[in-house]
Amino acid sequence: MRIAVIGAMEEEVRILRDKLEQAETETVAGCEFTKGLLAGHEVILLKSGIGKVNAAMSTTILLEKYKPEKVINTGSAGGFHHSLNVGDVVISTEVRHHDVDVTAFNYEYGQVPGMPPGFKADEALVALAEKCMQAEENIQVVKGMIATGDSFMSDPNRVAAIRDKFEDLYAVEMEAAAVAQVCHQYEVPFVIIRALSDIAGKESNVSFDQFLDQAALHSTNFIVKVLEELK
């Protein structure tokens, strides 16, 4: 099976890249694509760059040029739910934009005109990720909504404003909704699997620097387990 894995930063893709066999890397429009073999699958590992525009552009190139059957977006995120801690893993059930507001024209908050209010992750991929998480003893793994915006959420006031909009939000980051929207338009199944590098609003910038590598390791190990179980 041909599976694409997307991470925004070098720290988020380095470990998985080192695990690929027969790896070949090429750069297209500033985006790094590495093809290789892992767990019996042909894997295309994309380093997309940070933010929604980079994520949307690179995911479009990925789907047009490499035509993966499924897409997994991995990396770090900021925890939003009160039950979460740094290092925990969140599996998306749904992804939304938290910085889109066209409510003046009767759209839901976060809804892009012409698109659904949120983008549902593939149920089979979510179920598979849930199955893999049952073996995790030292890391809390949960599933829920992830929201995306082009801002790092270190301001408590902004965090509070987003909490008011999305009561069931588990994590925030800067690429997933763009990846999900492109996958939705191409009708390619996707899931987002993110490990928490910080808790949004609680000295997030300090925590992010300290725990990015830990989050990257947790998310990568989880991705490998999913690939091993994927048939």
Curated annotation (Swiss-Prot):
- What is an example of a Pfam family matching this protein? PNP_UDP_1
* Pathway assigned in UniProt: Amino-acid biosynthesis; L-methionine biosynthesis via salvage pathway; S-methyl-5-thio-alpha-D-ribose 1-phosphate from S-methyl-5'-thioadenosine (hydrolase route): step 1/2
Q: Which family does it belong to?
A: Belongs to the PNP/UDP phosphorylase family. MtnN subfamily.
Catalytic residues (positions): 12 (proton acceptor), 198 (proton donor)
Quote the EC number: 3.2.2.9
Species the sequence originates in: Bacillus mycoides (strain KBAB4)
The protein in question is named 5'-methylthioadenosine/S-adenosylhomocysteine nucleosidase
Q: Which reactions is this enzyme annotated as catalysing?
A: S-adenosyl-L-homocysteine + H2O = S-(5-deoxy-D-ribos-5-yl)-L-homocysteine + adenine; S-methyl-5'-thioadenosine + H2O = 5-(methylsulfanyl)-D-ribose + adenine; 5'-deoxyadenosine + H2O = 5-deoxy-D-ribose + adenine
Q: Which GO terms describe its molecular function?
A: adenosylhomocysteine nucleosidase activity; methylthioadenosine nucleosidase activity
UniProtKB keywords:
Amino-acid biosynthesis, Hydrolase, Methionine biosynthesis
Biological process (GO), any one: L-methionine salvage from methylthioadenosine
Could you give one GO CC term from the UniProt record? cytosol
What function does this protein fulfil? Catalyzes the irreversible cleavage of the glycosidic bond in both 5'-methylthioadenosine (MTA) and S-adenosylhomocysteine (SAH/AdoHcy) to adenine and the corresponding thioribose, 5'-methylthioribose and S-ribosylhomocysteine, respectively. Also cleaves 5'-deoxyadenosine, a toxic by-product of radical S-adenosylmethionine (SAM) enzymes, into 5-deoxyribose and adenine.
Gene3D superfamilies assigned: Nucleoside phosphorylase domain
